[in-house]
C-alpha cells in the first residue's frame, strides 16, 4: 500500500507538470530537505522512571536522519502538494511515509470562490499560539517550518476590497466521535480592515464539542510596532483525564477521553522591529483546555508513589507500565500548562537569520529555550539549532522524554 501511495502521488504531480504548455510557467516545484536530529533523553519524568525500573519499557528517543521531498503543482481550478518522507532512527526500522498535503479543486465566480478537497485553512493571529485556528489547528513552535497537512473541506469565500467572509465544512465524511482537528465541524470567519487594524470574528460548531466563538485583531501601530490579540470561548473541549479510581497500580491505562465545559483561550502579544531588522516578539496566553495546576500536582504525586512501590514489594513490571501510562498527560492539550509567556528575538542579516526564543510557564518555572541559525541562498538553505528544557526538577517541561534536541538541515529548492 505504501508503494502504491508513493506511485500515485508521483503520477498525479508529474502528469500535471507534463500538461503545461511550453510558454507557461512551470507547474511543478518543490524542495528536498535532509535533516539530522540528535536527542538527549531526560533523566526525569515518568518515562525515564519506567525505563529505570524495567529497561526497555519506554525506549529513549534516538538520533536519526530524515529525507523529505515536498512537491507542489497547480493548474486552472486545482492545486496539489505532497510530502514524501523517509526516516531512519537508531534502533528503529526505516520508515517511509507519503501524503497529499493539499489536493483541492477551486472555482472562482467573481467575488466568490468555492473549494472542495484537502486544503490548508489557517486562521487567526499570533505566533506561538492561536486560539481561533479552528479549522487547521496547526502545531506551533516547531523546530523547522514544514508544509502542514490540510483538512478535508467544503468551503465558500466572499471577498471585497476591505472585507472577507468564509464558510467551511471541515471533515464532512468523518465520524462524529473524532477529536481535535479530525472532528467534523462547521466554521465561519469574517475579516474587516479598518485603517491599520485587521479585525477577525470566528464561529465553530463541532459535531460533539458544540459551539465556540471568538475574535481577534492585529494593529500595525507604527513602522516599528505591531500589536495583536485573540480570544475564544468554547462550549466544550476534548481533553484527557485520569480515572479517580486509579489510586495505585491498575491493569489498564487509567487515562481516558473527557470533555471540559466552557473553557476559555486568550492571547495578547506584540512585535517591535528596529532599523537594523532586529525583532522582538512577546506573547502571553491562557489555555483553559490544558490540564489544571491541581491535575498536574496530582499527576506528580502519583508518579512519586508509583516509583516507590517496587521497594514495597509491588511487581516491577506493573509499576513500570503504570508510569509509562502517565505520559498520556502530555497529549491532553496543545499546551501543557494553562498560563504561558513567550519571547522571541530574530534578526535579518541579509542571508543570515539568527533566532532565540523562550517559552516560560509561571505555574512551575518550567522553561523551553531554542536557538537557531538560518542561511538562505538562491536555491539552497542551511540551518541548525538546539532546543532544551530547563527549570525546577518537578516542572512539567522537565518531565518530557527529551531533555535536549539539536538539528542540522539542508534544503534545495527546485
Regions found by a protein language model. Give the residues of each.
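Transmembrane beta-strand segments that form the barrel wall of outer-membrane beta-barrel proteins
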Residues: 79-90, 101, 136-140, 165-173, ...
